[in-house]
Amino acid sequence: MAKKVFKRLEKLFSKIQNDKAYGVEQGVEVVKSLASAKFDETVEVALRLGVDPRHADQMVRGAVVLPHGTGKKVRVAVFAKDIKQDEAKNAGADVVGGDDLAEEIKNGRIDFDMVIATPDMMAVVGKVGRILGPKGLMPNPKTGTVTMDIAKAVTNAKSGQVNFRVDKKGNVHAPIGKASFPEEKIKENMLELVKTINRLKPSSAKGKYIRNAALSLTMSPSVSLDAQELMDIK
């Protein structure tokens, strides 16, 4: 088994020039050629930003609706009441509730990928914050998941919204499609993500904003990208 894995990786590494930072177009082409798993692998971009997340004014966080989605079916839970519950259901939310939903979550129900809430329900959401927070599911105004426009938020989530935030080391990881996507769709998704991240550059960040960038599949080595080319995307 280990021998098979080693041979597979060796074959994949042979397709990459380790000392080269690829342009977006060529990088996408190379990473697609690395698809070798028996399932449709996720394409992920990783960026190392020149920020210090220990400072609140350098915390890069946001959301972007990818033009071609992520290729993943997203289950959405909504905390709302009265007419807003109806709006959520009509927009296609999978789970809708209030205190009852909070109780279900306390009892172990986490069968959704994104949580949206109206502002007046955040006190209820707060009761399960310790459960949702570590899973990256806590609603936040910066990602458009705390809003009165529930229908739009649910539609965005279902259409391929990706929420992102910089980690303690200044890295951002985000899915931008599947290996089965045409190269052009992966490229357009990545450009939309990078454009959004560039717009969120903190004014206090110094030096190069995008220090390193890489593209990879679920089961593949990473392909280095030209960070300067990404910083020039507006």
Curated annotation (Swiss-Prot):
Any matching Pfam family: Ribosomal_L1
GO biological process: regulation of translation; translation
Entry annotated with the keyword rRNA-binding: yes
Record-linked PANTHER family: 54S RIBOSOMAL PROTEIN L1, MITOCHONDRIAL, LARGE RIBOSOMAL SUBUNIT PROTEIN UL1M
Family to which the UniProt record says this protein belongs: Belongs to the universal ribosomal protein uL1 family.
Name by which UniProt lists this protein: Large ribosomal subunit protein uL1
NCBIfam families xrefs: rplA_bact (TIGR01169)
Classification via PROSITE patterns: RIBOSOMAL_L1
GO molecular function annotation: rRNA binding; structural constituent of ribosome; tRNA binding
Assembly and interaction partners: Part of the 50S ribosomal subunit.
Species classification: Bacteria, Pseudomonadati, Campylobacterota, Epsilonproteobacteria, Campylobacterales
Keyword match Ribonucleoprotein: yes
Function field: Binds directly to 23S rRNA. The L1 stalk is quite mobile in the ribosome, and is involved in E site tRNA release. Protein L1 is also a translational repressor protein, it controls the translation of the L11 operon by binding to its mRNA.
Keywords: Repressor, Ribonucleoprotein, Ribosomal protein, RNA-binding, rRNA-binding, Translation regulation, tRNA-binding
